[in-house]
């Protein structure tokens, strides 16, 4: 068996990736979230596949087909709620995974980091088009508002929006193509995740100390497979508690009403995991400026390898940047809260301050703290 897994063309790839992979001996539980993301993706693809068997992407029947899944399909309610709450778990793991990458300086592995950003954007796109499918009020108006942002692009904006809509408003053509995108994108994400792993295994994993760990590596199996299994069981436990006891806690009450183009909800807002970006979008009065800020709020992650001037890897021995990092996390939570609030004083002002802080921390405060810490080392 040992010879087979080391020599067989297919098993050899699995062996080098998950069994005999040399791994730093000191990586903490913060490194578990990569495998948890893989688990989330598998859950989403499986539950999504079963939902797609019963869902109809037609404006007249989409809402009732989701109700039919919950009422008439065997365990359809469970599959639907696992899928809906699985998306929330996916994004929780994703935010922690990116946060760990920033804290421990994993962005130094630039190819892995940049593919990670592409994965992040694709996951956001998948979640957005997926939210439109139940065809409730918030689905319809969320799709209308967010796709309409593209009209801010000079010259081609209006044409682009109508091209995406497949008509002059969000309608049957839009729903059909969004269903097609929602079905295909997770498989593209899975392919990119493999490329993400490929680049990671070229350089080897980072570790909490930020030091070179070539002299102290252990095989991935059994040490980290068992550790990952614990993380997976905990993730499944939280997901099952969410799906069985609080299935609608992260949803929007407006989505229990079928889509009605003649009735606008009081507060149009996306799912909770987009609220931070939505708050940044809303904090700029100019439409094009808001769209640019929205895109930059994610793409700015690509600036981390370029702006890092520190002589140390990661923040574990850098108290000044540690304080700034935790202010950054708190600021993100404030943005998430503001994104769900109505557009009125004082929320608009808090949102504008938090948006400026978000970009200032990454582009100004962190590079300054890097320089300060470099000078402290010289003393």
From Swiss-Prot:
Any GO BP annotation: mitochondrial electron transport, ubiquinol to cytochrome c
Cofactor binding, per record: Binds 2 heme b groups non-covalently.
Residues that, per the record, bind heme b b566: 97, 196
Gene: MT-CYB
Cofactor: heme b
Protein name per the record: Cytochrome b
GO cellular component: mitochondrial inner membrane; respiratory chain complex III
Localisation: Mitochondrion inner membrane
Described purpose of this protein according to its UniProt entry: Component of the ubiquinol-cytochrome c reductase complex (complex III or cytochrome b-c1 complex) that is part of the mitochondrial respiratory chain. The b-c1 complex mediates electron transfer from ubiquinol to cytochrome c. Contributes to the generation of a proton gradient across the mitochondrial membrane that is then used for ATP synthesis.
